[in-house]
Amino acid sequence: MSSSLSQTSKYQATSVVNGLLSNLLPGVPKIRANNGKTSVNNGSKAQLIDRNLKKRVQLQNRDVHKIKKKCKLVKKKKVKKHKLDKEQLEQLAKHQVLKKHQHEGTLTDHERKYLNKLIKRNSQNLRSWDLEEEVRDELEDIQQSILKDTVSTANTDRSKRRRFKRKQFKEDIKESDFVKDHRYPGLTPGLAPVGLSDEEDSSEED
């Protein structure tokens, strides 16, 4: 009678343990009870439960670490993107001001120097910026406008210099014709009239 009760108690205990394992550790092999003899492949019931619980805790800790690491990376990317977007928007606003000053002809020397540097590096920067399409298009339009206006201004300056040089050259020619040897009209400068020796010419100049 006591043996039957003991066997029943063992089955009940085994069922309880298997129920706990099923809830806590899904997929873990169940403990089998056989004719009053409990066989466990890796040791006693307590050892098996302890080992599996530790394994479960390790897996949970590893998952928590991965989740924290992933969240940290996501947060870092968001902060970086927010900072980049802010810098790009500030630069866009600055370019718009420069564009306005360019059209109005009120660029300062500092702004003009900045534009010269901007034109050289703007193409590479535009490729690397991660902006919305419309912002990228706006920046490209500003770049092209600035480049066009700057080149036009440079061409105008060169044209003015060429016209001034031509005018100056013509004036120099006229002045040169006017200051010919006025003592002997019609003669090429540097030539003395027939009969006038070099000594006479030299004495007169003295």
Swiss-Prot record:
Biased composition, class Acidic residues, residue ranges: 197-206
Statement: the UniProt record of this protein carries the keyword ATP-binding: no
InterPro entries per the UniProt record, alphabetical: Rrt14 (IPR031404)
Residue ranges, annotated region (Disordered): 178-206
Keyword Isomerase: no
Phosphoserine: modified positions: S197, S202, S203
Subcellular location field: Nucleus, Nucleolus
Main subcellular localisation: nucleus
Pfam family name, one: RRT14
GO cellular-component term (any): nucleolus
Keyword list, A-Z: Nucleus, Phosphoprotein, Transcription, Transcription regulation
Protein role: Involved in ribosome biogenesis, probably through modulation of rDNA transcription.
Family: Belongs to the RRT14 family.
Other notes: Present with 3670 molecules/cell in log phase SD medium.
Name by which UniProt lists this protein: Regulator of rDNA transcription protein 14
Organism: Saccharomyces cerevisiae (strain ATCC 204508 / S288c) (Baker's yeast)
